[in-house]
């Protein structure tokens, strides 16, 4: 299966994403180590192979524009036979996050998670992919653990 390719080029960023159903392999280079880590986790736990290359002026611009590019790439990579709804709860040490997803074409995000940058990533991703996502932080104190559990869920 050929990967879906989505590119975004603005005054602030240049992003290229390839996505396809696969084994959850990831090749990610955004210049932001934590974002690379989250995109690798998203690929692994979704079973979607992702190749992401991103450059930009500010961390905030890169994070948002990666979301705006990964969203449609994943949406287009899903087969028409994919289940519309899904839910998963993921623990990460003291953190526990529940995600409920609808890929039916109605963009909406209900959070929050305790990081304004990555909460904004989720909202931008949902808007661009036209997905509905509800995230509930059931437990947790470490922001890294909560955000990572959210991406894995």
Language-model features: where?
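Polyanion-binding surfaces on beta-sheet-dominated domains and ring/shell assemblies
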Residues: 1-153
